[in-house]
Amino acid sequence: MEGQRWLPLEANPEVTNQFLKQLGLHPNWQFVDVYGMDPELLSMVPRPVCAVLLLFPITEKYEVFRTEEEEKIKSQGQDVTPSVYFMKQTISNACGTIGLIHAIANNKNKMHFESGSTLKKFLEESASMSPDERARYLESYDAIPVTHETSAHEGQTEAPNIDEKVDLHFIALVHVDGHLYELDGRKPFPINHGETSDETLLEDAIEVCKKFMERDPDELRFNAIALSAA
């Protein structure tokens, strides 16, 4: 992806919550850490949960899987509800922001926005756009990149040089119309992972996260955060 490049966001609830606050989201939903994937640790996550963001490494194994998955879906097809808000990623390192947009856009009816919210405005103006049009609109939407840069510098680890190649990537896992969708701006379409509900979203999303980890057992760079009712 040549063209625009942003500083990467951390999978850090403090950073993501501050970012959403700057975008005009009322803190009635907040990101929290998912400390582990077994039932005992998942029980510590406040409920309800309306989205999970997974940060994972883009490895050779993953890229092989991604290509195979894409080809399989193209040949076999899949059901995707038109209610899913999905956008492509054309800006390098913007996957964290796009993950947040995917999480909020697909739960807009649960969110409270402050008056003049730049995120609400972006979602309203891009509602009828195609995934590619939304990507181009984000490139020209000045308010979000400025906020993103501020948040990238607020992380616990030092922000990398903007030209540095980053091999970590965010995806969002959300519940729309009874199904669990993986939303990844690097992919041509949402991935339907089967049935879910508001009550089981966290557990169902974590099952998908586990598959990412199983594909790369030598990798440790996985991190999940959940969007929970505050």
UniProtKB/Swiss-Prot annotation:
InterPro entries linked: Papain-like_cys_pep_sf, Peptidase_C12_UCH, Peptidase_C12_UCH_sf, UCH_AS
EC number(s) recorded for this UniProt protein: 3.4.19.12
Keyword annotations from UniProtKB, A to Z: Cytoplasm, Hydrolase, Phosphoprotein, Protease, Thiol protease, Ubl conjugation pathway
Residue ranges of the region described as Interaction with ubiquitin. Crossover loop which restricts access of large ubiquitin adducts to the active site: 152-159
Disulphide linkage map: none
Activity regulation statement: Inhibited by monoubiquitin and diubiquitin.
An individual GO BP term: ubiquitin-dependent protein catabolic process
Catalytic residues (positions): 95, 169
TM annotation in the entry: none
Site (Transition state stabilizer): 89
PROSITE patterns registered for this protein in UniProt: UCH_1 (PS00140), UCH_DOMAIN (PS52048)
Residue span(s) of domain UCH catalytic: 5-229
Catalytic activity, reaction form: Thiol-dependent hydrolysis of ester, thioester, amide, peptide and isopeptide bonds formed by the C-terminal Gly of ubiquitin (a 76-residue protein attached to proteins as an intracellular targeting signal)
Region (Interaction with ubiquitin): 8-13, 219-224
Principal location class: cytoplasm
Cell compartments where the protein resides: Cytoplasm
Protein family per UniProt: Belongs to the peptidase C12 family.
Protein name (database record): Ubiquitin carboxyl-terminal hydrolase isozyme L3
Species: Sus scrofa
Organism lineage string: Eukaryota, Metazoa, Chordata, Craniata, Vertebrata
